[in-house]
């Protein structure tokens, strides 16, 4: 079994979900007392969040690249970045290491393609919904048409992630708000919705939405288990 490197802590709420999914995935496939070989580096998210919102992405890239090198030095065979937003600096992280990076958008796109989805809604932080590092990859590499909410809805989605979900604060009112936004995306033609922030599944993962939901944390972890056991 290969050792999975996990760059986490962004936020730790979703890193818990990753750790559970990786271990459950290995146990389901191998049975018994088997569990995943995981090397985790969990960063202090407060500093990362400040750099995100100040726009200092080069500093986040340097910080996370150093963590990735430490994971590699510890013996990991490949790397997961356990957050959608910080895939903005995935190229810099990938350039800093010699082990493969399993990209969260690629794993999600492969699942969408396998299911025949061509037009998909995207929820996440404003960075993920508005910037090209994620949407552009889905469009250019996989030919997916990506829909995002309007500006006011994007702001609500973003605020709920940082002010509530990253703190483990799960509110029914926010769940209803997300479901309404997803219904609007479905009305606009989305065949499915990507939960493009690893915390969102904590809020709506068990809900019956207007369209199928693609939980990027679960998909990323499943792809990692497949690679680890290949």
Please give the residue ranges for each predicted region.
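Non-catalytic structural scaffold of enzyme domains
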Residues: 1-230
